[in-house]
Amino acid sequence: MIDFRPFYQQIAVSELSSWLETLPSQLARWQKQTHGEYAKWAKIVDFLPHLKTARIDLKTAVKSEPVSPLSQGEQQRIIYHLKQLMPWRKGPYHLHGIHVDCEWRSDFKWDRVLPHLAPLQDRLILDVGCGSGYHMWRMVGEGAKMVVGIDPTELFLCQFEAVRKLLNNDRRANLIPLGIEEMQPLGVFDTVFSMGVLYHRKSPLDHLSQLKNQLRKGGELVLETLVTDGDEHHVLVPAERYAKMKNVYFIPSVPCLINWLEKSGFSNVRCVDVEVTSLEEQRKTEWLENESLIDFLDPNDHSKTIEGYPAPKRAVILANK
């Protein structure tokens, strides 16, 4: 099973020490309520070997290189274990000569977002809805002091720990299996990321308030979410599904989203990027058996979802507390 005690030791001597008032008991409850597959996934992490690493690159990729090349048999055993943790959604990872080609080219998003950010060097960072942690490792590559990701999905936790093990057990990033609504307001993070979360929230303004409560005064929010065209009054509320997703509630226009952030008390709100999701960025691979973007779009008109809504378009908004 995954041991959170090293994380407790890390935060005991950091600005996050007050989190120890609630976090250990929360995770103890979580461990009693885990999904039936969790024990199997955690064992797969245990089965992965400890490998000597010659070089780790988190600046331009998430990549580890072995001291000596792995044999074909060693590679195949690792691939077998990693494929037991499918589907791999956010990546890619290059681990000891193994290319984990995930559904999403999350490096595309990172390349769009990074140039606009306040430098991450020596920052304490929270990544909300972090998935398997790809962007967390890229934040570490930019010199972050510590990156904490939160995501309640047990598979993502096990994928993260598998990658960590193949990155020489790097402790600068940690994934905690909670939702932001379960976090006590800490108010200490220099940068808070929420990417691909807001449209899944029934109450988007509550989510913005929760993000603000984790930031220090002057800290930076990085918000990436689905948007639609329109003025400051326009919000798309899908009837049943959007791109085959049942849990999409509100897709605002960029001016509307800026208004929400200002209404929530953020300052210096600005949109730095808007991009239609491409079939190169989200696609099927051998590491994903499920459907992907091509299956969610109108086969005769890729500017629309299969339900007839505008195809996914994402904006990056920055703001300060």
Curated annotation (Swiss-Prot):
Coiled coil: none
Protein known as: tRNA U34 carboxymethyltransferase
One GO BP annotation of this record: tRNA wobble uridine modification
The organism's taxonomic lineage, starting at the top: Bacteria, Pseudomonadati, Pseudomonadota, Gammaproteobacteria, Pasteurellales
Annotated source species: Mannheimia succiniciproducens (strain KCTC 0769BP / MBEL55E)
Sorted UniProt keywords: Transferase, tRNA processing
Family: Belongs to the class I-like SAM-binding methyltransferase superfamily. CmoB family.
InterPro entries, alphabetized: CmoB, Mo5U34_MeTrfas-like, SAM-dependent_MTases_sf
Cited function: Catalyzes carboxymethyl transfer from carboxy-S-adenosyl-L-methionine (Cx-SAM) to 5-hydroxyuridine (ho5U) to form 5-carboxymethoxyuridine (cmo5U) at position 34 in tRNAs.
Catalysed transformations (reactions): carboxy-S-adenosyl-L-methionine + 5-hydroxyuridine(34) in tRNA = 5-carboxymethoxyuridine(34) in tRNA + S-adenosyl-L-homocysteine + H(+)
